């Protein structure tokens, strides 16, 4: 049995005591006593976790342990913070300082004795219930050692939902044919129960070569149970017209008219994924003309939704997999491994494993989701005894299933087993996903910072960062088919992850079972939280409404995190006198993105939250920050990405534990920030030389990501400052000087020896020679550079480039040439608003791995020859160019694009 959530908390407390042992010197006797009791407690918790489903008293004991651990953390942290603040204030009178010191020590000594006594009582109670000590060496292992061990034993195996399809090939062809060839229908619908593969099937149809060639544009929108009509319309518009920028503030009626007109004028395919009710279609349909070139692919659990949308629609009902198909799918996942080069190889199937596997897949009820999750679980087991343990856990569900409810119970048992098998760090990571609303695209960087703030993931002495560790965790959950990760080949890092709704139900159930999280779905802006329901949960997630205001009605010291998720186009309003912050004094994580503060002032009581590690005010309505922010000494993450002008006091320098800092884009003119003491920063966003000295960067030697605005004459010191940032991997540099200064880009990047992603918006007549760049540079984004010489001969010799974007006057010359053998790794290329470009030559053998090409508003550019040489090209997007007639079937240049599966024309008819 993998370790439980409570045991993880005990490990964290153990780590805290070890890490701060030097600062706790002088009261070591009490601390040592606490550590001894923690050691005894750890040896009991494995057995207790295994028996928690059998006994309510055991569950109560585990809850007591969780509360004791939290209390101990708070006591230790508060003591250390008080000591630090006393030293910082520099109390002049020695006697007064000594008196304060002795009082604090006596209180701390007494508090630790109380904690130790409580643990002793819990241990006695557990033993009276027959809980056994399990001493296997694991309990004494540090978190870093456990994480290292987990990483070492990890195996890779085939896990592509697209390649793991079984038994649907003919269905894909039929559905694609109806979308393209049947002019009598507007809607094709796919129906079936949750987890049966509707979305996977729809995705295969969506990417079918025939479909991609037929339509001019494509949109894919998830429709949740509680969707906003305007949000669905916005997503459709953004996907069909991606070049038209932000439309979040567009009036709903104007948006409806624009979308209606757009769908009248071209052949577009819109996918509405997971429409629940017929009434949902009625709310969305106003933007769709009665009969034009648009078609819709719709998925739903309700067969009647498609018929309601279009009585002539073609309806396809998905079927469950046969036992043979289920085993074939499971076998693909378990026994087809990838080596280090990515090559698939088959592993010999043990007869006993095969026999057990064929029985176990019957519990999946023919649902592909459950089969894939079971496969992901079994792929981590490599011996017959390990398989036997999984088999025994599923055993009670292998027989006697005679109803739909029995089948669902067995399916959920399989999904739950995947959770129970996780190592304790991954359990926390998985449970944290329960915070997010249904169908929410979870931004992985944001998730990693939540996890870091709670100590679920930590950086390591070997240079492994929080982001590295977080990506390892998500990859493992994806390998187990518990989540899906959206990997954008344009960029280095993963962008978003999601859960299937059935897996999310398991996540929510486990979070409730562990008292991990309380979710408040507030249906209206005036709805409030019932304070009584806060009694058990250590984490709160508020979905919409104005409920934050009512949190001040009670004090709940158990709450460690509070995340607010606004409805579309909605802001929660917090009064300036809100007692909310004082009511939740032990918060570690506070996300108030898109909260509107009365009078534009963040209450000074924010400074009372001295335990905060994470504070996000992204897109919040704030014009004034209080100086009490200086009290937040433990902050790791601070996001001040506000709307509008803001007053920022010079107190950020005191947050010396910060790893991530996003500054406001616009601050008062007199603002001068001193940031040189922030030596632990790994990400610094929106740094401007208008508000801080570029010399401060010299001290931030751990920076891996930097976005920098130059607004004054500090360009001469820029190169020397950046040269000290030897860990820098991502650099975004923008010149806002008037008049613009010409740069030699090579001086800027010469010493950035680990640079992988570079964005330059600076005046740079000539692109630097390739030898000035780090050889593993992967992504370049150049705009407003006014380069007079063709940069391609240099760029194409950067052998590891995966994406290149040249936009908004990056190049002002007339001719570009991509030569044979150039860009050997390039996957994505975008040419946009290059107004002087007339000729682009693509030689045969150039860009052999290019997957996506976008050409946008290069008005003088002639249709490039040589595109047909790029045989790897899968997506060609052409925006605002007069080439459509030549490139559609029957056009004189159609041969150049006929082998590209997806060719889109946007605004090409004018």
UniProtKB/Swiss-Prot annotation:
LRR repeats (start-end): 584-609, 610-632, 634-655
InterPro entries membership: Apaf_helical, Disease_R_plants, LRR_dom_sf, LRR_R13L4/SHOC2-like, NB-ARC, P-loop_NTPase, RX-like_CC, Rx_N
Residues in NB-ARC domain copies: 169-461
Pfam families, per database record: LRR_14, NB-ARC, Rx_N, WH_DRP
SUPFAM superfamilies xref list: L domain-like, P-loop containing nucleoside triphosphate hydrolases
Coiled-coil region list: 22-60
Keywords: ATP-binding, Coiled coil, Leucine-rich repeat, Nucleotide-binding, Plant defense, Repeat
Gene Ontology molecular function, alphabetical: ADP binding; ATP binding
Keyword Transit peptide listed: no
Domain of life from the UniProt record: Eukaryota
An annotated GO BP: defense response
Family assignment from sequence similarity: Belongs to the disease resistance NB-LRR family. RPP8/HRT subfamily.
Protein name: Inactive disease susceptibility protein LOV1
Source organism: Arabidopsis thaliana (Mouse-ear cress)
């Amino acid at each position: 049995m993998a370790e439980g959530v409570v045991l993880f908390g005990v490990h964290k407390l153990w780590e805290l005591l070890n890490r701060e042992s030097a600062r706790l010197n002088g009261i070591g006797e009490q601390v040592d006593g606490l550590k001894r009791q923690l050691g005894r407690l750890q040896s009991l918790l494995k057995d207790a976790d295994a028996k928690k489903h059998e006994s309510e008293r055991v569950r109560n004991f585990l809850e007591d342990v969780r509360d004791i651990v939290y209390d101990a953390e708070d006591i230790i942290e508060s003591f250390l913070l008080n000591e630090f603040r006393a030293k910082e204030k520099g109390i002049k009178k020695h006697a007064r300082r000594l008196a304060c010191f002795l009082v604090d020590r006596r209180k701390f000594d007494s508090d630790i004795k109380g904690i130790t006594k409580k643990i002793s009582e819990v241990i006695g109670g557990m033993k009276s219930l027959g809980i056994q000590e399990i001493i296997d060496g694991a309990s004494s292992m540090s978190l870093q050692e456990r994480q290292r061990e987990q990483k070492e034993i990890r195996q890779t195996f085939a896990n592509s939902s697209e390649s793991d399809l079984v038994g649907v090939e003919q269905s894909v062809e039929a559905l694609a044919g109806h979308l393209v060839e049947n002019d009598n229908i507007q809607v094709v619908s796919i129906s079936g129960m949750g987890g049966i593969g509707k979305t996977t099937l729809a995705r295969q149809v969506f990417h079918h070569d025939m479909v991609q060639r037929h339509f001019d544009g494509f949109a894919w929108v998830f429709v949740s149970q509680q969707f906003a009509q305007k949000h669905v319309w916005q997503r459709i518009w953004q996907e069909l017209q991606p070049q038209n920028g932000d439309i979040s503030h567009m009036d709903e009626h104007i948006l409806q008219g624009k979308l209606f007109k757009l769908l009248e004028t071209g052949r577009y395919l819109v996918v509405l994924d997971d429409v629940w009710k017929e009434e949902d279609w009625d709310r969305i349909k106003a933007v769709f003309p009665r009969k034009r070139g648009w078609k819709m692919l719709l998925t739903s659990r309700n067969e009647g939704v498609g018929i309601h949308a279009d009585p002539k629609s073609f309806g396809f009902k998905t079927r469950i997999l046969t036992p043979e198909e289920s085993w074939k799918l499971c076998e693909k996942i378990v026994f087809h491994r990838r080596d280090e080069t990515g090559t698939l190889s088959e592993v010999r199937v043990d007869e006993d494993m095969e026999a057990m596997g064929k029985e176990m897949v019957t519990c999946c009820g023919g649902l592909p989701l459950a089969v894939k999750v079971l496969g992901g679980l079994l792929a981590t087991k490599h011996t017959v005894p390990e398989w036997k343990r999984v088999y025994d856990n599923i055993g009670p569900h292998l027989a006697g299933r005679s109803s739909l409810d029995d089948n669902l119970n067995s399916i959920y048992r399989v999904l739950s087993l995947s959770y129970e098998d996780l190592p304790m760090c991954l359990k926390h990571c998985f449970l944290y996903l329960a915070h997010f609303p249904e169908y929410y695209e979870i931004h992985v960087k944001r998730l990693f910072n939540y996890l870091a703030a709670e100590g679920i993931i930590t950086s390591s002495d070997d240079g492994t960062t929080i982001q590295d560790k977080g990506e390892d965790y998500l990859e493992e959950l994806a390998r187990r088919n518990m989540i899906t990760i959206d990997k954008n080949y344009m960029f280095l890092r993963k962008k978003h992850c999601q859960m299937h709704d059935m897996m999310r139900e398991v996540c929510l159930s486990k979070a409730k079972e562990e008292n991990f999280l309380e979710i408040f779905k507030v249906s209206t802006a005036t709805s409030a939280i019932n304070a009584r329901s806060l009694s058990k949960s250590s984490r709160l997630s508020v979905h919409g409404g104005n409920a934050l205001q009512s949190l001040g009605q009670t004090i709940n010291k158990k709450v460690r995190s509070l995340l607010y998720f606004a409805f579309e186009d909605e802001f929660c309003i917090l009064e300036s006198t809100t007692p909310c912050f004082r009511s939740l004094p032990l918060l570690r994580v506070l996300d108030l993105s898109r909260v509107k503060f009365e009078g534009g002032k963040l209450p000074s009581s924010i400074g009372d939250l001295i335990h905060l590690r994470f504070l996000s005010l992204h897109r919040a309505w704030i014009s004034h920050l209080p100086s009490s922010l200086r009290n937040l000494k433990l902050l790791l993450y601070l996001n001040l990405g506000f709307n509008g002008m803001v007053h920022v006091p010079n107190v950020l320098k005191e947050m010396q534990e910060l790893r991530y800092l996003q500054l406001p884009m616009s601050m008062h003119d007199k603002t001068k920030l001193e940031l040189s003491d922030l030596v632990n920063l790994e990400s610094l966003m929106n740094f401007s030389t208008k508000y801080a000295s570029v010399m401060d960067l010299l001290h931030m030697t751990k920076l891996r990501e930097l976005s920098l605005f130059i607004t004054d004459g500090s360009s001469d010191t820029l190169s020397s400052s950046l040269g000290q940032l030897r860990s820098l991997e991502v650099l975004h540099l923008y010149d806002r000087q008037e008049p613009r200064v010409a740069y030699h880009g090579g001086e800027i990047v010469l010493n950035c020896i680990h640079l992988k992603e570079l964005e330059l918006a600076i005046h740079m007549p000539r692109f630097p020679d390739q030898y000035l760049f780090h050889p593993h540079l992967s992504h370049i984004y150049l705009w407003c550079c006014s380069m007079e010489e063709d940069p391609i001969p240099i760029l194409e010799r950067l052998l590891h480039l995966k994406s290149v974007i040249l936009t908004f006057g990056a190049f002002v010359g007339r001719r570009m040439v991509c030569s044979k053998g150039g860009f050997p790794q390039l996957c994505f290329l975008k040419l946009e608003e290059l107004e002087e470009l007339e000729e682009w030559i693509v030689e045969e053998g150039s860009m052999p791995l290019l997957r996506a090409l976008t050409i946008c508003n290069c008005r003088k550019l002639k249709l490039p020859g040589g595109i047909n040489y790029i045989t790897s090209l899968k997506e060609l997007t052409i925006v605002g160019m007069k080439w459509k007639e030549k490139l559609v079937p029957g056009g004189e240049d159609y041969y150049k694009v006929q082998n590209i599966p997806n060719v889109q024309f946007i605004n090409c008819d004018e």
